[in-house]
C-alpha cells in the first residue's frame, strides 16, 4: 500500500498530463511514436494502451485510425484520456487486466514496468499483455535505463548533494529508485538493458527486440535546440534511428522499447 500511495501522490500532481509535450519528454514521445509506427499492424488495429497515462500516445494512435482502449490506475489520467476522440479509457491494473484473451493486435506497456519494483509483478504484467494479444500481434514495453538517474542528477547538478548521491549510487546497483523528494521522480524500477529480455522470455515472449529511444541525446537535445526546428529535429531522429539497435549504446539511453511478436 505504501508503494501505491507514493506513486499515486506523484501522479496526482498532474505533471504527467503534459510531460511528453516539452523538453526531454518531447524526444521520448517522438522516438516512441516513430518506432511504434514502424512496428504496429496497419490501421485499424485493436490497440490496448496499458498504463497509458493521460493519453499522449493514445491520441495519435486513434488519429492514425487504430481502435484504442486505454487502461490506467489513476482516475485523473483516465479522465483526461477519456476526453480524446476515439479513445476508450478505463481504470485498471497492468497485472490484472479485465480484458478477454487474444482481443488485441497490439498491447503497449509504456509506463507500468517503471513502477513495479518486484520482478514477479513485472513478469505478471507482461504475461497479461501476452494473454490479451492475438497471435501475430505485438507486445511493446518501455523501460527506464538503470543509469538514467545517474546521468540525470549529473546533468542537473544534484549529484553533489549527499542524499541525492546516496540514492543514485544505490539504484545503479539495485535498480530500485527510492527518491526523498518528488523532483527526483517517484518510486520506480530502472532496468539493466539485458534483464528486460529475460523478463519477456519468462512471460513467454521470445525473440524480443530492443530499441534505444533517445540514445545519449536526451542529455542535451532540449538545451541545444535540436527539438525546436523541423530540419534539426528530423536530423536528430535520423541519427538516433541509425544506432537504435546497437547494444553497446543501450545503457546511455534514458528509455528502451522492447518488442516481441506473440506466438
Predicted regions located by residue number:
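A short SAM/SAH-binding and catalytic strip from SAM-dependent methyltransferases
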Residues: 105-120
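C-terminal lobe and adjacent flexible extensions of AdoMet/dcAdoMet transferase-like proteins
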Residues: 199, 203-263
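A short acidic, Gly/Pro-enriched loop at the edge of an enzyme's catalytic core
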Residues: 95-107
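Conserved class I S-adenosyl-L-methionine
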Residues: 1-43, 56, 60, 80, 138-170
Amino acid at each position: 500500500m505504501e508503494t501505491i500511495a507514493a506513486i499515486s501522490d506523484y501522479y496526482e500532481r498532474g505533471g504527467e498530463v503534459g510531460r511528453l509535450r516539452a523538453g526531454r519528454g518531447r524526444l521520448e514521445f517522438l522516438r516512441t511514436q516513430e518506432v511504434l509506427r514502424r512496428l504496429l499492424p496497419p490501421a485499424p488495429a485493436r490497440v490496448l494502451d496499458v498504463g497509458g497515462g493521460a493519453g499522449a500516445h493514445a491520441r495519435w494512435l486513434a488519429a492514425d485510425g487504430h481502435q484504442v482502449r486505454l487502461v490506467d490506475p489513476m482516475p485523473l489520467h483516465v479522465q483526461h484520456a477519456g476526453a480524446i476522440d476515439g479513445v476508450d479509457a478505463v481504470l485498471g491494473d497492468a497485472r490484472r487486466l479485465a480484458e478477454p484473451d487474444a482481443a488485441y493486435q497490439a498491447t503497449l506497456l509504456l509506463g507500468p514496468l517503471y513502477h513495479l519494483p518486484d520482478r514477479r509483478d513485472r513478469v505478471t504484467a507482461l504475461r497479461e499483455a501476452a494473454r490479451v494479444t492475438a497471435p501475430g500481434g505485438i507486445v511493446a514495453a518501455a523501460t527506464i535505463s538503470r543509469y538514467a538517474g545517474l546521468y540525470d542528477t549529473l546533468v542537473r547538478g544534484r549529484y553533489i548533494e549527499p542524499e541525492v548521491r546516496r540514492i543514485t549510487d544505490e539504484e545503479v546497483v539495485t535498480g530500485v529508485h527510492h527518491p526523498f523528494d518528488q523532483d527526483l521522480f517517484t518510486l520506480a524500477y530502472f532496468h539493466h538493458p539485458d534483464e528486460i529480455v529475460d523478463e519477456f522470455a519468462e512471460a513467454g515472449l521470445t525473440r524480443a527486440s530492443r530499441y534505444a529511444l533517445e540514445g545519449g541525446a536526451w542529455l542535451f537535445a532540449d538545451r541545444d535546440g535540436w527539438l525546436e526546428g523541423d530540419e534539426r529535429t528530423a536530423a536528430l531522429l535520423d541519427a538516433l534511428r541509425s544506432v537504435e539497435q546497437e547494444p553497446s549504446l543501450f545503457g546511455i539511453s534514458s528509455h528502451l522499447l522492447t518488442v516481441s511478436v506473440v506466438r
